[in-house]
Amino acid sequence: MGTRASSITALASCSRTAGQVGATMVAGSLLLLGFLSTITAQPEQKTLSLPGTYRHVDRTTGQVLTCDKCPAGTYVSEHCTNMSLRVCSSCPAGTFTRHENGIERCHDCSQPCPWPMIERLPCAALTDRECICPPGMYQSNGTCAPHTVCPVGWGVRKKGTENEDVRCKQCARGTFSDVPSSVMKCKAHTDCLGQNLEVVKPGTKETDNVCGMRLFFSSTNPPSSGTVTFSHPEHMESHDVPSSTYEPQGMNSTDSNSTASVRTKVPSGIEEGTVPDNTSSTSGKEGTNRTLPNPPQVTHQQAPHHRHILKLLPSSMEATGEKSSTAIKAPKRGHPRQNAHKHFDINEHLPWMIVLFLLLVLVLIVVCSIRKSSRTLKKGPRQDPSAIVEKAGLKKSLTPTQNREKWIYYRNGHGIDILKLVAAQVGSQWKDIYQFLCNASEREVAAFSNGYTADHERAYAALQHWTIRGPEASLAQLISALRQHRRNDVVEKIRGLMEDTTQLETDKLALPMSPSPLSPSPMPSPNVKLENSTLLTVEPSPLDKNKCFFVDESEPLLRCDSTSSGSSALSRNGSFITKEKKDTVLRQVRLDPCDLQPIFDDMLHILNPEELRVIEEIPQAEDKLDRLFEIIGVKSQEASQTLLDSVYSHLPDLL
């Protein structure tokens, strides 16, 4: 029992100890959170207002209040106070607001649409009046003009819109356009062969194909025992030719010693395809007059490539006294579709011909590549392998020199190394900056720490190693790392160097002299110290004088998160916003147009009526923003910061 009681007592004491430790940890965590909240409370007061709110200065107390914005289609009729919320009212007729706002009156709608324009969007509480040209017209030089009408033989290539005219093109081969139009494209010619018809008249760019029935001889269901029917595409008529069993007058049927051969002949002056009138056929030698009945004249007008000759086949008369039988028979022909094979239409065979041509080209390319590769394998490389290795090593050795020249800024005949400038300022923070830039490990950082005596030497070697290690190293990344570690003072020094307003110590920014200007700069090693650092006086070439330092990265350098410093050129003229920062914002806005109205709405409570009138008279939004920078920049630093906060909140791409 004593042992059991002692164990229970020990467990209770352990549980009390664990509870005390847990309570102590919870209390410590709460204290740490409270400390962090007190640290971050002061910067949070300077951050921009939350979305959906605006700042208002109470005229009675002078206190800056944060009020909720009014929704789109309304305006603030009464601002909020310490005791009441803001009051919103609907926009009156003829005014509008597109976004939630904190303005005291709505924007006026645009003027009514001039004739002949029509309204796409009417003037409403949420939208401004928008005018467009009516259908069939497009806007040109502020007026509406009718769409161009494509003439005959031309078709619409691109349909016209409200802002662009119609584009016409001449009808290609196989297409036509027979009416002037501003909406119709070229139509394809009628496929006569596909409809089992003949092309009577080929089409042009202005007319369609003229199709007709095919000419053939029908032998089914004849009207009589000796009748042949002719079909023509234009003259659908039937001509009956009497049978040869008809016994004309004056012909002796008992004459068994003579034979008659009746055949139509085509004279040299008559075009093929016509059947001349043969009224009689005489046999002068025998003295017997044999006449045939006069058949009706048949005239056929066909295309030049369809010509037919009607031939009357001869018949033999039997000597036994029977009636002679002379029948008119059509020549034996194949199926009418056989005529289609006489004409080669390239449009029908063009697709598979193109496919065959591409396959042939592909085969030729493969064969040539195989032959070339086989020759290369047989001959071997043209150069000695050792020479190739030497060239590769030379290219690698030249890379650090090019990277190093990238970071040199020429000023007053001296080459100033930006990396050395940063290394001289960051001090012991170079470790954090180097790890941020390269994602380096502690082992790599320790290598630089053991190889040099001073912090600026370690920082310079680490930054050089960063530029050589990553070819994508840029000034924007370096500035981002400096801001990440709250070294805006170094960024301002770089700005001052570019603006030529800061007196720098040239002995600290001198470049190390290399033994030979042509020898490649080796990769900085942690075990080698930088010695013999002297001032490098370099006269830049005309190309170096004309080119801008870090042309593609000037915008990130000049884009700051606070108002201007006293060293900037524009601040000396009395403005709290630097010219570089303003130009950066305006350049970005002009390159990528966006809606700037929310920025103007945020600044209305700072502008007086005269300044507001001046800004409203400017037509272009970018010019309005430029003027707004000039007006707000000379008011106060707080107003300038409010404008910058509004710009960065509504244009997040600038960050």
UniProtKB/Swiss-Prot annotation:
Q: Which GO terms describe its biological process?
A: adaptive immune response; axonal fasciculation; B cell apoptotic process; cellular response to tumor necrosis factor; humoral immune response; myelination; negative regulation of B cell proliferation; negative regulation of interleukin-10 production
Chief place where the protein resides:
membrane
Covalently attached lipid (S-palmitoyl cysteine), positions: 368
Known tissue expression? Detected in spleen B-cells (at protein level). Ubiquitous. Highly expressed in adult spleen, thymus, testis, prostate, ovary, small intestine, colon, brain, lung and kidney, and in fetal brain, liver and lung. Detected at lower levels in adult peripheral blood leukocytes, lung, and in fetal muscle, heart, kidney, small intestine and skin. Detected in T-cells, B-cells and monocytes. In T-cells expression is highest in Th0 cells, intermediate in Th2 cells and lower in Th1 cells.
Q: What is the membrane topology noted in the UniProt record heading this document?
A: Single-pass type I membrane protein
Q: Give me the segments passing through the membrane.
A: 350-370
Q: Which residue stretches does the UniProt record annotate as biased composition, category Basic residues?
A: 330-339
Q: What ranges does the record list as Polar residues composition bias? A: 241-262, 276-302
- Tell me which domain of life the UniProt entry assigns to the organism this sequence originates from: Eukaryota
Q: Where are the TNFR-Cys repeats?
A: 50-88, 90-131, 133-167, 170-211
Q: How is it modified after translation?
A: Oxidized in response to reactive oxygen species (ROS), leading to endocytosis.
Keywords of the record, alphabetical order, are: Adaptive immunity, Apoptosis, Cell membrane, Disulfide bond, Glycoprotein, Immunity, Lipoprotein, Membrane, Oxidation, Palmitate, Receptor, Repeat, Signal, Transmembrane, Transmembrane helix
Q: Where is the Death domain?
A: 415-498
Chain segments carrying region Disordered: 222-305, 318-339
Which Cys-Cys disulfides exist here?
67-80, 70-88, 91-106, 109-123, 113-131, 133-144, 150-168, 171-186, 192-211
Q: Which PANTHER family match?
A: TUMOR NECROSIS FACTOR RECEPTOR SUPERFAMILY MEMBER 21 (PTHR46921:SF1)
Its quaternary organisation is: Associates with TRADD. Interacts with NGFR. Interacts with CASP8.
Q: Please identify the protein, giving its name as recorded.
A: Tumor necrosis factor receptor superfamily member 21
Q: Which organism is it from?
A: Mus musculus (Mouse)
Q: Which gene encodes it?
A: Tnfrsf21
